[in-house]
Amino acid sequence: MNDTIQATDAAHAHSTHQHSMRALAIAAIGVVFGDIGTSPLYALKEAFSPAHGIPLTESSILGVISLLFWAIILVVGIKYLLFVMRADNNGEGGVLALMALSLRPLDSKTRVAGALMALGIFGACMFYGDAVITPAISVMSAVEGLEIATPHLSHLVLPITIVILIALFWIQRHGTALVGKLFGPIMVVWFVVIAALGVYHIARVPGIIAAINPYYAASFMADHLLQAYVVLGSVVLVLTGAEALYADMGHFGAKPIRLAAYGLVMPSLVLNYFGQGALLIQNPKAIENPFFLLAPEWALLPLVVLSTVATVIASQAVISGAYSLTSQAIQLGYVPRMKVLHTSELAIGQIYVPVVNWLLLFVILCIVIGFKSSDNLAAAYGIAVTATMVITTVLACVVMVKVWNWNRLLVGAIIAIFLAIDLGFFGANLLKVAQGGWLPLGIGALLFFLLMTWYKGRHIVKERTAADGIPLEPFLQGLLAHPPHRVSGTAIYLTGNDKLVPVSLLHNLKHNKVLHERTIFLTFVTRDIPYVRDDTRLSSRDAGGGLYIVKAQYGFNETPDVKAVLEEFGRSHDMTFELMDTSFFLARETVVPTHLPGMSIWRERVFAWMHQNAAKPTDFFSIPANRVVELGTKIEI
């Protein structure tokens, strides 16, 4: 009897686990695979762009389809899903998480560590270069289906694209948790539809299946040489969004993403590309728009609508990724403080960063108006993706050797294959710099300069502060030995270094000559892991006389919460805190550029401008503004 009950419980647990896995896989399809899932709208069309001069013969079609197929298998199916996704930082993925993981076993002061940090930051900057192109090209290519379905409405493609994009960014501040539940099922429908369209045409031209043989890819490269290498720059469009598989791993887990990729996404993409190839063999004139011409005439308008919805979902994933990456970069100290709003009480990852939102929209609208069509924009797409792919491979190599202690020869063999592929794609995309590749490169380079300037500037400020600082604990002992006038209430001094006396305390003692009966020195520290366990978050020291030194640790995926820290500290020390009865003392730093060693004077001025425009600590830490006392201090750099 007991055996029967245990067997039933085990079967129920297994069934529940499978159901949960399927639910996560469907949710992942709606978030992770939107970008790569909408690539069939433009990838093959761009590969046979007239500018490439590739004839639409059966052999060249088989060759290009073979290249697309093996790019998906090698880069998505093997590199990312089997290797890169193993390199998780406590379950979190993405280029910054990978960078933090690769730096962990290294001395942060070495040149190697500095180079890896710069690589990781540049990879993050290139993501933003990609983030401004994905919504523009995706939505535009979907709306361009109107040119096939109803040619007399072709003049409305640009206005409709602009309206959709403005609406998409406008709703961000309200959160997308509610409609987000529909993303997964809608994208499942999308992948089923594009697979069915592909199967229909494969059945009519079954010879296209021969493209599975890599001989056709190799033969195409050998026959066309330089032209074929240029085509590689378009082939990479089938991989846009591959980085999202790794970047969004923390939201869904590796297993659900692999299940979705191998079970639905990759088969659907392959079937659709093969279907487009079959259509072109049958009717080379279909190169006008091979994706939409897969559909029978009666299904064109519904397919345009479904495509538009799918591209909006793909754009949403990129926008959410930009918010998450910005939040990580703020916590890791690479970006100035910005206002980060949580749009859902239930979902921790649902955030909204107003500055990023409106900057993205402005740049995207400029791109749409400037490039006017997805064909023109396709030349700009790919270089940011391939640069990030190369950086991910290099950082993963360091993790394999330094963190996992894999055999160096084995790692060398694996990385040599992946780097050869990545660098091949990256080199092909460099040929498109003049046609539009300058755009993501320019955006990435500008952001890289700003982020490195901010990081270097903050480092100099910390050095100057530490050099002039006074050790905290001896100072407090002296203060208690000769105490100033004590006043009732609680004072919280926010400080970046729990070993030094906050400048705000020195100014308060100098001008007001009082010390609150309960005084807390609070320091927030960001770790190189995504999340910190609640039971290890707080550490505190009782300095006596109602003085406490408190350190709160957060992961780079978390947002510091002053209220939660005080509540936790109060519980452990049998105290209560009311924010409206507590005074917060902050040092308002004014950075003064000088000719002191550190950075060139013009970079110091840029840093000073960034510092001046960073979000106020009251906004960032959600402290009531009427409970804050800011005391000014000048720092020469």
Curated annotation (Swiss-Prot):
<dbReference type="InterPro" id="IPR023051">
    <property type="entry name" value="Kup"/>
</dbReference>
<feature type="transmembrane region" description="Helical">
    <location>
        <begin position="182"/>
        <end position="202"/>
    </location>
</feature>
<keyword id="KW-0812">Transmembrane</keyword>
<keyword id="KW-0406">Ion transport</keyword>
<keyword id="KW-0813">Transport</keyword>
<comment type="function">
    <text>Transport of potassium into the cell. Likely operates as a K(+):H(+) symporter.</text>
</comment>
<dbReference type="GO" id="GO:0015293">
    <property type="term" value="F:symporter activity"/>
</dbReference>
<feature type="transmembrane region" description="Helical">
    <location>
        <begin position="351"/>
        <end position="371"/>
    </location>
</feature>
<dbReference type="Pfam" id="PF02705">
    <property type="entry name" value="K_trans"/>
</dbReference>
<feature type="transmembrane region" description="Helical">
    <location>
        <begin position="24"/>
        <end position="44"/>
    </location>
</feature>
<keyword id="KW-0472">Membrane</keyword>
<feature type="transmembrane region" description="Helical">
    <location>
        <begin position="409"/>
        <end position="429"/>
    </location>
</feature>
<protein>
    <recommendedName>
        <fullName>Probable potassium transport system protein Kup</fullName>
    </recommendedName>
</protein>
<keyword id="KW-1003">Cell membrane</keyword>
<dbReference type="GO" id="GO:0005886">
    <property type="term" value="C:plasma membrane"/>
</dbReference>
<feature type="transmembrane region" description="Helical">
    <location>
        <begin position="151"/>
        <end position="171"/>
    </location>
</feature>
<keyword id="KW-0997">Cell inner membrane</keyword>
<dbReference type="Pfam" id="PF22776">
    <property type="entry name" value="K_trans_C"/>
</dbReference>
<keyword id="KW-1133">Transmembrane helix</keyword>
<keyword id="KW-0769">Symport</keyword>
<keyword id="KW-0633">Potassium transport</keyword>
<dbReference type="InterPro" id="IPR053952">
    <property type="entry name" value="K_trans_C"/>
</dbReference>
<feature type="transmembrane region" description="Helical">
    <location>
        <begin position="225"/>
        <end position="245"/>
    </location>
</feature>
<feature type="transmembrane region" description="Helical">
    <location>
        <begin position="290"/>
        <end position="310"/>
    </location>
</feature>
<feature type="transmembrane region" description="Helical">
    <location>
        <begin position="261"/>
        <end position="281"/>
    </location>
</feature>
<dbReference type="GO" id="GO:0015079">
    <property type="term" value="F:potassium ion transmembrane transporter activity"/>
</dbReference>
<dbReference type="InterPro" id="IPR053951">
    <property type="entry name" value="K_trans_N"/>
</dbReference>
<keyword id="KW-0630">Potassium</keyword>
<comment type="similarity">
    <text>Belongs to the HAK/KUP transporter (TC 2.A.72) family.</text>
</comment>
<feature type="transmembrane region" description="Helical">
    <location>
        <begin position="113"/>
        <end position="133"/>
    </location>
</feature>
<feature type="transmembrane region" description="Helical">
    <location>
        <begin position="64"/>
        <end position="84"/>
    </location>
</feature>
<dbReference type="InterPro" id="IPR003855">
    <property type="entry name" value="K+_transporter"/>
</dbReference>
<feature type="transmembrane region" description="Helical">
    <location>
        <begin position="381"/>
        <end position="401"/>
    </location>
</feature>
<feature type="transmembrane region" description="Helical">
    <location>
        <begin position="433"/>
        <end position="453"/>
    </location>
</feature>
